[in-house]
From Swiss-Prot:
Keywords linked to the UniProt accession: Cell membrane, Membrane, Transmembrane, Transmembrane helix
Any Pfam family matching the protein: VTT_dom
UniProt KW Membrane keyword: yes
Family label: Belongs to the DedA family.
Name assigned to this protein: Uncharacterized membrane protein HI_1629
Recorded coiled-coil stretches: none
CC per GO annotation: plasma membrane
Lipid bilayer topology: Multi-pass membrane protein
UniProt xrefs under InterPro entries: DedA-like, VTT_dom
Intracellular or extracellular location(s): Cell membrane
Amino acid sequence: MNQFFITSINIIKKQEQMEFLIGFFTEYGYWAVLFVLIICGFGVPIPEDITLVSGGVIAGLYPENVNSHLMLLVSMIGVLAGDSCMYWLGRIYGTKILRFRPIRRIVTLQRLRMVREKFSQYGNRVLFVARFLPGLRAPIYMVSGITRRVSYVRFVLIDFCAAIISVPIWIYLGELGAKNLDWLHTQIQKGQIVIYIFIGYLYYSFLEMEKI
């Protein structure tokens, strides 16, 4: 019962967030989408999927002013820019960045240790999976910079390959359901379930590869 109540609260919060973002994006257009996606990369508690869907919604509502394909391009730039910022903060400042209180809230020592263990265990594959893990994405990208295990070019290529799977789906889903938000919220929940299944499949594949 408690879990059902918590889930209901989360759904309501996401609906409110989407309504706010749709209004914000309608007012300020592509630049607003770019800005929000970049700060999402810093671990700000704004769901990236809701942000992308909201960008797609305004493309569906105002096709004469907003092009969905251009929205996809802007979104990809925003996603990669936000992720790159976390990488470079880690690469430039190293563990010193953890002295900065806002960063310390995102990248705790416990998360830092856990991410380092995952890197040792799975290598660069962790970067690909990180794109689908909202709570761990920022710490993983920052640690990849801190440890310097991967060059920036390789980092961007891996991040791009992961982003090009999810970003278009959310953008075009938002465009498709722009005039039926109730249906859209249902599809978002289904999409999130598919992502969790995909992550589980990747995790299982990694375990199988280790046995070989």
